[in-house]
């Protein structure tokens, strides 16, 4: 589809369709369900968590909140896990 053909199909009355990926790193200030819903409404499609910081419980709460926010808005959100540096991981 040409750029002109694409532009002709756009409508101000339809929700914005993103063609890119917006990755947001989730931290303490964006961990709540309401904050996550705001990020999703703003275009977030991937929630990134930095495993270098935080406990297992903190990360589980974040995952649960991302899933709940996505379910309430009826969208799919990917979860990216950024693990610690160049270590050898087993199991």
Curated annotation (Swiss-Prot):
It holds the Pfam family PK. Keywords: ATP-binding, Glycolysis, Kinase, Magnesium, Metal-binding, Nucleotide-binding, Potassium, Pyruvate, Transferase. It catalyses: pyruvate + ATP = phosphoenolpyruvate + ADP + H(+). Its cofactor is Mg(2+); K(+). ATP binds at residues 50-53, 89. Its EC number is 2.7.1.40. One of its GO terms (molecular function) is potassium ion binding. K(+) binds at residues 50, 52, 82-83. Pathway: Carbohydrate degradation; glycolysis; pyruvate from D-glyceraldehyde 3-phosphate: step 5/5. InterPro entries: Pyr_Knase, Pyrv/PenolPyrv_kinase-like_dom, Pyrv_kinase-like_dom_sf, Pyrv_Knase_brl. Substrate binds at residue 48. Homotetramer. Belongs to the pyruvate kinase family. This is Pyruvate kinase. It comes from Leishmania braziliensis.
């Amino acid at each position: 589809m040409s750029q002109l053909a694409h532009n002709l199909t756009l409508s101000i009355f339809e929700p914005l369709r993103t063609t890119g990926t917006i990755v947001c790193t989730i931290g303490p200030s964006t961990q709540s369900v309401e904050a996550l819903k705001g990020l999703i409404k703003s275009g977030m499609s991937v929630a990134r968590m930095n495993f270098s910081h935080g406990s297992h419980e903190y990360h589980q709460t974040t995952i649960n909140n991302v899933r709940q926010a996505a379910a309430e808005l009826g969208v799919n959100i990917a979860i990216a896990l950024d693990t610690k540096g160049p270590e050898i991981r087993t199991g």
